[in-house]
Amino acid sequence: MSRPILVFDSGIGGLSVLAEIRKSLPHSDYCYLFDNARLPYGELEEQVLIAGCVALVCDLVARTNAMIVVVACNTASTVVLPALRANLSIPVVGVVPAIKPAAQMSKSKRIGLLATPGTVKRHYTHELISQFADDCHVELFGCSELVMMAEQKIATGQMDMHRLADLLAPVVAAQLDVLVLGCTHFPMIQAELQQVLGAGVTLMDSGAAIAKRVVTLLTQQNLIVEERRVTNERETLGESAMQAFYTKAEISEGLTTTLIDCGFSTIERITTTN
């Protein structure tokens, strides 16, 4: 494995970001680290969150010789990014809720942000709204339960649509034309969200913007892998280029199958003391 792109999240939500990056950089190697032992991040004390994330990510960067870290978690991005950047010499990219493009796209100037309670209440989020959506009426919806529903869907293939409709009732009532998905888990259930909200609501996430930023940074450092590498007449891209690491004692058969279907050949538990 060459120097990989390390994508980090609390759970499986970051797979949506990894998929966007792979569209732009299909020949790169990838590590996916998900700290599912401490999911959901939005309920952790900030200092506990920072200490655990820094320890996990820095250890795996050292182990894999990663060339860039993508924090594919909105909660971690608003809290942990400065500490990670202070402890790493490689680029660290975070997630920014797509407030600016949502405000630009909205015709009714009624937009919403669906995220975890932690992201909704953070000062950074309100700064984004003031800076980029001052001409819009912005509704904020914080819901941790949707994160666990996305995890459950990946693990079992099942989604409680009645419960989803109940959770989204305030969003429907707000009569928005654009809704920002402010958690990387939410694109994993985008079809179900769209079904409940209807075709009149455009859903926006940050995946494509993150991928663009990663490409820019790696291009600046001349680290783009331009073509498939061939060893013994076989391409090394694929199974050998995809590694997944998790922190919980065990993961479900459904999640294991999902990771294999995504192309991961190595699925390994790592431990943390934080």
UniProtKB/Swiss-Prot annotation:
GO terms for biological process: cell wall organization; peptidoglycan biosynthetic process; regulation of cell shape. It comes from the Bacteria. One of its GO terms (molecular function) is glutamate racemase activity. Keywords: Cell shape, Cell wall biogenesis/degradation, Isomerase, Peptidoglycan synthesis. The active site is at 73 (proton donor/acceptor), 183 (proton donor/acceptor). Its EC number is 5.1.1.3. It is an enzyme of class 5 (isomerase). It catalyses: L-glutamate = D-glutamate. Substrate binds at residues 9-10, 41-42, 74-75, 184-185. InterPro entries: Asp/Glu/hydantoin_racemase, Asp/Glu_race, Asp/Glu_racemase_AS_1, Asp/Glu_racemase_AS_2, Glu_race. Pathway: Cell wall biogenesis; peptidoglycan biosynthesis. Belongs to the aspartate/glutamate racemases family. Provides the (R)-glutamate required for cell wall biosynthesis. This is Glutamate racemase. It comes from Shewanella baltica (strain OS155 / ATCC BAA-1091). The gene is murI.
